[in-house]
Amino acid sequence: MDAILNYKSEDTEDYYTLLGCDELSSVEQILAEFKVRALECHPDKHPENSKAVETFQKLQKAKDILTNEASRARYDHWRRSQMSMSFQQWEALSDSVKMSMHWAVRGKKDLMLEESDQTPTDKIENEEQDEQKEIKKEEFGSTTEKMEQKESKSVEKSFSPQNPDSPGFANVNCWHLRFRWSGDAPSELLRKFRNYEI
């Protein structure tokens, strides 16, 4: 009982900090961080350093616990519960003792970005729809260009391009700009932004 009351957490107990990663890190990320830190403090590279062996063993233990799914779940549960005992003592307890202890466990951190729920077939269908939209835009663009050319020819006949003060010159340019604005279809990204889906 005294051990629990006098317990002080050590930095070596936080395996995520020891490896330099986060509780949301994947196994691949954990292994990559382990390799970097293991190369820095490997006992073979630093034979004169007496703490190199101890540090390497802690890194190895952290990697073993965090790369195993079951032991990582137990470690995360212990870490979030903030129990006043070391992880080794927690592991030594039987499941019945763990069940009889009541405490509030903090939840896991939320992801900053949501994972994609789309399946590969959904992505292919979306890509096909995007291609069809682009083809329609290109067709629409070529027809509008033809219309613009016809309009500009008729405008050239009725108004002098060298005289911008002629009565209908400004009106023609405004109509041209309005037509372009109405012809531009909003992109899918813009639609999602406007509908607060992003």
Curated annotation (Swiss-Prot):
The keyword Protease does not apply. It comes from Bos taurus. The lineage of its organism: Eukaryota, Metazoa, Chordata, Craniata, Vertebrata. Residues 112-167 are annotated as: Disordered. Pfam families: DnaJ. Its main location: cytoplasm. The keyword Glycoprotein does not apply. SUPFAM superfamilies: Chaperone J-domain (SSF46565). The modification Phosphoserine is found at S160, S166, S182. Interacts with HSPA8. Interacts with TPH1. Interacts with TPH2. Keywords: Acetylation, Chaperone, Cytoplasm, Phosphoprotein. GO terms for cellular component: cytoplasm. Probable co-chaperone that participates in the proper folding of biopterin-dependent aromatic amino acid hydroxylases, which include phenylalanine-4-hydroxylase (PAH), tyrosine 3-monooxygenase (TH) and peripheral and neuronal tryptophan hydroxylases (TPH1 and TPH2). This is DnaJ homolog subfamily C member 12. The gene is DNAJC12. It is found in: Cytoplasm. Residues 120-156 have a biased composition (Basic and acidic residues). Residues 14-79 form the J domain. It comes from the Eukaryota. The modification N-acetylmethionine is found at M1.
